[in-house]
A protein has these predicted regions:
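Active-site machinery of serine-nucleophile hydrolases
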Residues: 1-43
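Surface-exposed acidic, glycine-flexible loop patches that form ligand/cofactor-binding
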Residues: 2-4, 41-48, 88-94
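Sec-exported extracytoplasmic/periplasmic mature domains
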Residues: 6, 39-46, 69-73, 125-129, ...
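Stable alpha-helical elements in mature extracytoplasmic
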Residues: 30-37, 59-67, 71-74, 116-120, ...
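Primarily recognizes the serine-hydrolase "nucleophile elbow" in alpha/beta-hydrolase
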Residues: 50-96
Length: 191
């Protein structure tokens, strides 16, 4: 906290959850815990709902990329590092109003992180969204993590965007009830 002079910003930094098979952030129990944490923070007197950020490293990079897309309407900006999710798990469409930074080492081939980061960059290049996606030359899984938060802190959430894109994707069989100012009144029967 002493490193950054951007109060009253709040950063949510997912790491490997300590419960559940495979320790993943997309599991329902983690979603419920995360939503409760967000609600409690938003009720605090010091909360600035337009200065809420998410970033993570490695497993936290996967988690923060999925959470960035699933809860894009909450974040001022998002910054996964040393991660890289398949786009079906973290659709870029939801990032229209959420500045997004993804930094991965160009030599980080574990779990195809460098390839998945390149796919994310190629998809975002087709948009006019605010983003920074880079494969850092000469780096493997351990990159310079200090580059992300100063970039994120430049941005504040726009609570009333003129345009919204929302791919209503599921995480662990669960969908959001709404997104931004949209609400789902009825879902089609998919059985």
């Amino acid at each position: 906290a002493k490193r950054f002079a951007d109060a009253p910003s709040v950063y949510f930094i997912p790491q490997i959850p300590q419960e559940g098979k495979w320790y993943r952030w997309w599991q329902r129990s983690k979603q419920w815990a995360f939503e409760k944490l967000l609600r409690q923070w938003l009720l605090s007197a010091s909360a600035d709902p337009n200065r809420l950020y998410v970033f993570g490293i490695s497993e936290g990079g996967y988690g923060s990329q999925r959470l960035a897309s699933f809860y894009a309407d909450y974040w001022a900006a998002a910054g996964p590092m040393a991660g890289g999710e398949p786009l079906k798990n973290a659709p870029i469409e939801n990032l229209r109003n959420t500045p997004f930074s993804l930094l991965t080492g160009a030599l980080d081939e574990g779990f195809y992180r460098n390839k998945l980061t390149a796919y994310t960059k190629a998809a975002l290049e087709q948009t006019k969204f605010v983003y920074r996606v880079e494969l850092l030359p000469g780096y493997g899984h351990h990159i310079d993590y200090s580059l992300t938060t100063p970039w994120l802190a430049q941005y504040k959430r726009n609570p009333t965007p003129l345009h919204i894109s929302w791919e209503d994707f599921e995480m662990d069989g669960r969908y959001r009830r709404g997104f931004s100012n949209l609400v789902v009144l009825e879902r089609p029967d998919t059985q």
